[in-house]
């Protein structure tokens, strides 16, 4: 059995506020409807001359182009499409972890992600945040104590704290994970919420240990209903994931991928 903690109730309250028309909840990471590219999407739909099919490969190529602008050099063979980052995280857990394994994440963890770990019987160890990201001294202590299978992090605008991990700390995190041979799952779906300053390179872009699995989604920055996310990793991982989630891919929206392809 499990129970809802006070923090989980707080998150539920934050998200319920997002549904009220009179307020925009900054805590729920739900954009104001007016900020979505509604006119652009409507134009794409009006000009659609065929039923969208086989959009997945075009989607992967477009994602490669987007990531190239972030100094991430990947091919379509390094990409697996999913509906959203929660699904990506769940599939990675299914593939790599067994009940009783440990994963380290930044504190606090949003309830949706905490539920993924809990439902799979994974022990979640959290590390406190500092103004520039995860407390790396406490992270190393946790690594030595629990021997985790993964480190899960959101270096850009961590949900829910909004903290951005500094460039120096990103480099140290990669060195620390490399020293202990622990893979990193980097979720980067909030990276476009920057309003000032320069965008910092992702962990994946700086990774010389080939230890980072990168997950991202267009869900937060594109209208709801167009759910397309992706996993970036080594080709052997992607090939295994393809076999694992071939059934789920049947339900990925070709229309949503078509709209994204045209918009990108």
Each PLM stretch: what is its role?
Residues 3-84:
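N-terminal small-domain helix-loop-helix segment of the aminotransferase-like
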Residues 29-33, 86, 110, 156-158, ...:
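Short, solvent-exposed loop/turn segments at secondary-structure junctions
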Residues 36-40, 195-198, 225-227:
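Short aromatic-enriched loop/helix-cap "lid" or pocket-rim segments at secondary-structure transitions
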Residues 28, 129, 205, 217, ...:
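Active-site donor-binding loop signature of nucleotide-sugar glycosyltransferases
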């Amino acid at each position: 059995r499990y129970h809802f903690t006070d923090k989980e109730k707080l998150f539920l309250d934050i998200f319920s506020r997002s549904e009220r028309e009179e307020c925009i909840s900054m805590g729920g990471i739900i954009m104001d409807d007016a900020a979505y590219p509604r006119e652009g999407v409507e134009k794409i739909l009006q000009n659609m001359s065929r039923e969208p099919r086989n959009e997945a490969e075009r989607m992967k190529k477009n994602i490669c182009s987007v990531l190239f602008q972030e100094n991430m050099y990947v091919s379509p063979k390094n990409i697996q499409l999913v509906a959203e980052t929660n699904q990506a995280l769940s599939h990675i857990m299914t593939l790599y972890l067994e009940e009783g394994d440990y994963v380290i994440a930044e504190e606090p963890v949003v309830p949706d992600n905490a539920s993924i770990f809990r439902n799979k019987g994974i022990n979640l160890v959290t590390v406190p945040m500092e103004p520039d990201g995860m407390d790396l001294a406490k992270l190393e202590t946790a690594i030595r104590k629990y021997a985790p299978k993964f480190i899960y992090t959101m270096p850009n605008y961590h949900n829910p704290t909004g903290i951005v991990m500094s460039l120096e700390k990103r480099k140290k995190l990669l060195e620390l994970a490399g020293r202990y041979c622990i893979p990193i799952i980097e979720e980067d779906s909030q990276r476009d919420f920057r309003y000032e300053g320069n965008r910092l390179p992702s962990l994946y872009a700086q990774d010389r240990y080939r230890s980072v699995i990168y997950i991202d989604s267009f869900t937060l920055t594109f209208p709801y209903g167009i759910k397309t996310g992706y996993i970036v990793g080594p080709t052997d991982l992607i090939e295994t994931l393809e076999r694992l989630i071939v059934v789920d891919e049947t339900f990925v929206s070709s229309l949503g991928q078509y709209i994204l392809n045209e918009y990108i």
